[in-house]
Regions:
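Short, acidic Ser/Thr/Gly-rich low-complexity loop/linker segments typical of extracellular
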Residues: 58-69, 76, 108, 146-153
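A short, solvent-exposed beta-strand micro-motif common in secreted/extracellular proteins
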Residues: 43, 82-87, 164-174
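A short, amphipathic beta-strand motif
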Residues: 26-32, 43, 85, 154-156
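Structured interaction patches on ligand/partner-binding surfaces of diverse proteins
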Residues: 105-106, 110, 141-150, 173-194
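A short, Gly/Thr-enriched small/hydrophobic beta-strand-prone motif that recurs across taxa
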Residues: 22-33, 202-209
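Short, ordered, surface-exposed loop/turn motifs in non-cytosolic proteins
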Residues: 34-59, 90, 133-137, 162-164, ...
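Short, surface-exposed beta-strand/beta-hairpin micro-motifs centered on an aromatic residue
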Residues: 114-116, 153-159
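Short amphipathic beta-strand segments in non-cytosolic proteins
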Residues: 43-62, 98-103, 134, 141-147, ...
Length: 219
């Protein structure tokens, strides 16, 4: 009898815990000032009520080299994630970063695997290649498990338990005034939608800088 009572108590406790925290979808719509949807903008939600956990040891992400470009151009990982750097090209790459969040160098050869790199410090990691100096990529190390990148419709969908959250966005071409913006959200059991319109246009890309009249790499 005691065993049955104990087992029943455990089941009831688990049931109560399951219903004490709802999961809701937060849809973040990100546009420029003209209302045009923006793709690959990182949306992040920080839980104001709880500490934001570090990723488990098994978390692995991939930053590939394809056609002498970083793929994806921008990778978002949770703090504590390991990142693999495969080389899908038939040429050598020499990937590096001097960013405070992660400093490293990797000589990458086709079909030769190297140990994944641990990204344990939140922040922006800018990637380059010593062999192909036009290559540029980013790894954003998030100190929250709640993040997503916007799709072609400018929508980022994040599933979170109920609570109070702070919403922010990031992209390498965002102005400082837009990356500094914060929105406070109180999330319950119902899905919500949030619109986020940029204050300023995206900064020019490297391709756009190179297209400036009269500029060449030899100037």
């Amino acid at each position: 009898m005691t065993y049955l009572c104990t087992k029943l108590s455990v089941i009831l406790l688990a049931t109560n815990l399951a219903f004490s925290s709802y999961a809701a979808q937060v849809s973040v719509f990100i546009t420029d000032k003209q209302g045009k949807p923006l793709t690959n903008i990182v949306a992040l939600l920080h839980n104001d009520d709880k500490s934001n956990a570090v990723a488990g040891e098994q978390a692995i992400a991939i930053m590939d080299q394809i056609n002498r470009e970083f793929v994806p151009h921008t990778l978002v990982v949770q703090q504590g994630t390991k990142v693999k750097f495969p080389n899908s090209d038939n040429v050598q790459h020499h990937v590096y970063s001097f960013s405070p969040a992660k400093t490293f160098e990797l000589k990458l050869y086709s079909e030769l695997e190297v140990e994944p790199q641990l990204f344990n410090t939140p922040g922006v990691v800018e990637l380059g290649c010593n062999v192909h100096d036009w290559m540029l990529g980013y790894i954003y190390v998030a100190d929250t498990p709640y993040f997503a990148q916007s799709n072609n419709e400018g929508k980022a969908i994040i599933t979170v338990p109920d609570g109070n959250y702070t919403l922010s966005i990031w992209h390498p071409r965002l102005s400082d005034s837009d990356t500094a913006r914060r929105s406070n959200l109180s999330i319950g059991k119902d899905d919500i939608a949030v619109s986020f319109s940029l204050f300023l246009p995206l900064l020019p890309s490297l391709v756009e800088y190179d297209a400036v009249e009269g500029f060449t790499e030899y100037d």
